[in-house]
Amino acid sequence: MLDFYSQRYLHSERQAWQERIEQGQIEVDGKTVDPTYPLQAGQTLTYWRSPWVEPEVPLQLSVLHRDEDLWAIDKPSGLPVLPGGDFVYHTVLEQLKIQYPQESLFPLHRLGTGTSGLLLLGRSTLGRRELSRQFREHICRKIYRTVIGPCDLPEKFECHQAIGKIPYPQLGYIYAASSHGKPAQSYGRILARSPEKTWLEVEIRTGRPHQIRIHLASLGYPLLGDRLYGPGGVPINCRTARPSDGGYTLHSYQLGFLHLHTQQAIKLTAPLPPELITPEVKTIALETEKH
């Protein structure tokens, strides 16, 4: 029993699994057993996990657009989209049910926990089906804003580094730059430069997990504050870092798609967080305030 849990579920140490078994938190066919109990095929294992308090995260969901088929919200950084790990109710999916109980809304694409900005929600059957198709067929345009350190990238640049799974302690695997991964395409342009920072806009034509973080890191310029991905687009030596860790700034800025009834092009934009407003724009705003 102990060997099974400690070798299969690596998120906890062997000693932790032993304590859970000895405390009766894990049952075999409804009965408590010793850590050395030999398991057999066909048995039912039950893990009675203790209740836990979910981490505090921003829960506000600003609605940017709504019609009979879809909504668009401004997701705050730090709020996961779907339940997983330590998060159930502190997620976009569950907060939609709590804050808008009369609606039937479901996220049509994913944003990383640390990513803020535009998130499309299907409201009707047509909206969920057709917008999912547009995402699947790469009809939707997805444009992000982010910030990296000083760089010598050209004003416009591309990255086509493949992204796939690689082994990673604790989690089993993680997505990173990999020659055996799936194709990924990102197209970026420089918005502004300073001695300490570079502001970027990046359009992704594919939707691989953590694509922008991996691609910019693979070019030698990880997102400022990213604890996970280092130069080369692979995890840095900090083996305790996880994909959901924050610290970086990445914003889903614009989404373009076809209207479900008229087929006309629609573009939605999310307000920029203060850290992504470029120096030129800040200067103009200050001059305007003076006048």
UniProtKB/Swiss-Prot annotation:
Keywords: Isomerase
Any one Gene Ontology molecular-function term assigned to this protein's record: RNA binding
Catalytic activity of the protein: a uridine in RNA = a pseudouridine in RNA
Enzyme class: isomerase
Its EC number(s): 5.4.99.-
UniProt keyword annotation of Nuclease present: no
Pfam families to which the protein is assigned, alphabetical: PseudoU_synth_2 (PF00849)
Domain of life: Bacteria
PROSITE patterns, per the entry: PSI_RLU
The keyword Isomerase is annotated on this UniProt entry: yes
Gene Ontology BP term (one): enzyme-directed rRNA pseudouridine synthesis
PANTHER family: MITOCHONDRIAL RNA PSEUDOURIDINE SYNTHASE, RNA PSEUDOURIDINE SYNTHASE 5
Annotated family: Belongs to the pseudouridine synthase RluA family.
Protein name: Uncharacterized RNA pseudouridine synthase slr1592
Lineage summary: Bacteria, Bacillati, Cyanobacteriota, Cyanophyceae, Synechococcales
